[in-house]
Amino acid sequence: MGRATYQLRSFYPTYPAHRFFNAPCQPPVLREWHNHFDNYGHFMPGYCGGISLGSWLELDELLEQGVDLDERPVLKFLIFEDMRGLFNFAEDFGYQEREQGYLSKCDLCTDLRTHLVSKQDFAELQPEEFYTHLA
């Protein structure tokens, strides 16, 4: 989604966060096809800019052993608890729901992650440049 949700917000209806709480994120995050490598060396899910599954330098190990979700709590919430879990996690870091609402689950996720990046360094929320150049 990236900047599109910020630039096109006035053209589409928005909804409260709870509308997207049960929208599944596991399939796009964990699928074995349509992934990307960014120019910073991150292995990324195909549709999820700003999320790193790990480094391309450790790709063989990553593909053999998988992602250590204990070291990547944001991914853990997205995989096992969808948006509701990530929203609750972000609230623990002071997140407040956006009054104007969200265009989609991806818009909500990006807003949650942007808030989390401002509060703490999360290995999976990379590259930092993704978040600093959103608006």
Regions found by a protein language model. Give the residues of each.
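Short microdomains enriched in Cys/His and/or Lys/Arg
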Residues: 122-135
